[in-house]
Amino acid sequence: MSSNSQEDNNKTTEKKNTLTVIDNRTGKSYEIPINHETVKSIDFRAIKEQSIDFGTMIYDPGYYNTAVCKSQITYIDGDRGILEYRGYPIEQLAEKSSFLEVSYLLIYGDLPSKEQSNLWNTKIMNHTFIHENLISMMKSFRYDAHPMGMLISSLSAMSTFYPEANPALAGVDIYKNKQLMNKQIFRILGKLPTIAACAYRHRIGRPYNDPSNTLSYTENFLYMLDRLSESNYKPHPVLTRALDKLFIIHADHELNCSTATMRQIASTLVDPYTACAGSAGALYGPLHGGANEAVLRMLEAIGTIENIPKFIEQVKQKKQRLMGFGHRVYKSYDPRAKILKTVTMEIFALLGKNPLMQIATELERLALSDSYFIERQLYPNVDFYSGIIYKSMGFPTDMFPVLFSIPRAAGWLAHWVEELADPELRIFRPRQIYMGRRNMNYVPMDARQVQQHNSGEKLSSFSSGFDRRRDVSEELFNFEDGAIPKTATGSKSQLSASIEQSFGEKISPQSH
């Protein structure tokens, strides 16, 4: 009897990897499987009030708590401040590896052997030159074109140079050919620094430099940025290594906005150039690729160390924002920020201290000793130091998102490769909750009533000088009968006299 009772107790307390949902509208109970701490949203479709209903959906603005793929690329534990690429701690990779080796790791899953590494480096560096027509296109941009706009446009244009790489032209199954896939990886990783360097040189009005394939990846990038006429120019090794570390820690970060964009666009089976251009477009946004620039503006606004206590009080009072602190994922110190803090000291030892760094260091010290920020788990993130480093290295702020895009392309391509190999791959198709009107009947234009509350806003825009001149002219002249009507600004004679005085000639209705 006791044995039977024990069995009953075991059955009662047996752990089940399921979630039980009770629909209080119907009283029905649903059991949903739990795997890897997740439930499938499609399982909730079975929960219906009536059999003809669509079913229950999960509402999650911004995908804040939604997993859209299974991945083996990057692991993050935000509570403990852990970041790993393919299981390797970011601290070890930043200290011991190189950007190209990390790129290989992200894309192919393992660290390369010496032979694989040599071949990989050679393949990438042999694809650093860009087509002369692409160079001509870049030279056609305005002198003050933003480098990120030039990079996005050039990436997109590259898809037209390689039609054999476009599934829309060459067939949806072309990337079952791994050699063809590898070719596009070599091209994108090889040519991105060249495009970025050309965009930078374009802004400062200097001729573009050809790549030097005898140099390392980041060394070659700095060479293309800074070489003047020297035949043997070589960037300083401290700067090269610092940039390599920056590239390593920016190479991937799980499903951030731009990487999620890569997966969404790539789910259509579009070519990787178009997908990378879309991802770079997402990174261009100030909430993604522009956060480190916002940190610099904050530090410059603080001005001196003496102003920091006042600034911190204003942050607590919600009068100021503390940029570079806190993260959507990390609830402890961002491991990338720890690495960059060391890199910052290396750069300053070579180039001299930046006054902003002194402000940043004191701001961090005071914030991390204040219970207000500790209780809210606000710690420095990667953007807090990256902008200071880039500025100290002499990069203008409009190059910051470009410097983010070059290394992040390795992560984008890793996710592209993984996604195309996923047997569960389907085109992304999020759902919406429709909140608008229904069952409206079409009303002829003459019978419609103007909605006064927004009639002036729907088509409003800033007026250019062209618009203002046209508006005044259309008020002044009646082109149909040649009459010049009175306007709110004055009579015909007053307006005519004003215009005649400005242009020094008589105005007639036919002079237009």
Swiss-Prot record:
Pathway: Carbohydrate metabolism; tricarboxylic acid cycle; isocitrate from oxaloacetate: step 1/2. Its EC number is 2.3.3.16. GO terms for molecular function: citrate (Si)-synthase activity. CDD domains: AthCS_per_like. Its main location: cytoplasm. The keyword Aminoacyl-tRNA synthetase does not apply. One of its GO terms (cellular component) is cytosol. Gene3D superfamilies: Citrate Synthase, domain 1, Cytochrome P450-Terp, domain 2. Pfam families: Citrate_synt. It comes from the Eukaryota. Keywords: Cytoplasm, Transferase, Tricarboxylic acid cycle. GO terms for biological process: carbohydrate metabolic process; glyoxylate cycle; tricarboxylic acid cycle. SUPFAM superfamilies: Citrate synthase. The keyword Membrane does not apply. InterPro entries: Citrate_synth-like_lrg_a-sub, Citrate_synth-like_sm_a-sub, Citrate_synthase, Citrate_synthase_AS, Citrate_synthase_sf, Citrate_synthase_typ-I. Residues 483-512 are annotated as: Disordered. It catalyses: oxaloacetate + acetyl-CoA + H2O = citrate + CoA + H(+). Residues 488-501 have a biased composition (Polar residues). It is found in: Cytoplasm. The active site is at residues 288, 327, 383. Belongs to the citrate synthase family. This is Citrate synthase. It comes from Dictyostelium discoideum (Social amoeba).
